[in-house]
Amino acid sequence: MSGFFHGVTVTNVDTGARSIALPSSSIIGLVDTFTEGPGATAKANDLILITSEREAVAAFGPDAAITRACRAIYSRAKAVIVACGVAKLSDRAEQTSAIIGSVLADGKRTGLQALLDGKSRFNAQPRLLAAPKHSATQAVGTALVALADKLRAIAIIDGPNTTDEAAIAYAENFGAKRAFLVDPGVRYWDTEQAATVDAPGSAWVAGLFAWTDREYGFWASPSNKEFVGITGTGRAVEFLDGDDTCRANLLNNANIATIIRDDGFRLWGNRTLSSDPKWAFVTRVRTMDIVMDAILYGHKWAVDRSITATYVKDVTEGLQAFMRDLKNQGAIINFEVYADPELNTASQLEQGKVYWNIRFTDVPPAENPNFRVEVTNQWLTEVLDSAA
């Protein structure tokens, strides 16, 4: 500070809690095939930001598989799609490799790997990942889950779309909390082909996730929500209310989401393929991911600040306000936030490390409401009272 000064001095006091913003929960990362040509402006392995069906058609052409996947998404939801179209190949093994992708000598990422550039290119980090039909191949499904771990996303994986037994066998290849398997596929009317066609379910489910996020919140389950635009499923899935031996329940018991016909076609299933029961519900995984990323992105301002009592107080109050907002929205039930007195030792503080604990209870889906109905003669004599 300077010495004597005759006049008014104004100083910015840069303290106080900061607000924490929620990241978008429903940006979709999509990889599928197309053919380069006059009807497509995109080049193979270009990363494209898509916000409408019209943009998808312009980029990939009207008949491309990736365009059909975009249509499936937009049939239900207004969504931002980070899309990477790969060349359509005749060799199945080469096609699988193209979908999985890699990093080229010049540093360009291809296939699924290109989705990692969504945030740096478009400030759009995918939270829902799909490689329609291709994810029914284990190599692609595994790569999709690995990518989901990096992005804190959900990998929506297609089942084999053949039999229940095949779907259950395929599910046993995974044990990840970010893997969400759906089987069978869907059927819909394709205006380009003027016919009913079969399609993998993952793009349709991604659209349903995005719609649920918009209508109910990222903490809500897409299960028991109706699809728009489909006319059937790849195979009929038996569903009977109250019957725990029906085929839909058999698939759900194997942690496979399925599609039932019950007042429309509905997604039916809340569970991931996690081998850890703590992460069984997809809603818990997504809530944790969003909370963690919001805290991560919301505290860049706190890095390299001087560790003072005011600093600890400001961070704590900001976290409390953020969690309080989530509670008021219904995203969580309750929470606690505090600077950890045991971890914040003089040695740790001297190294520039400060620890906060954020604990919360998420909102589970009512997967199994139970109603106990009893018939009794308790009020039978009331007929006599009424007659008196």
Give the location of each predicted region:
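Surface-exposed assembly/interface segments
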Residues: 1-388
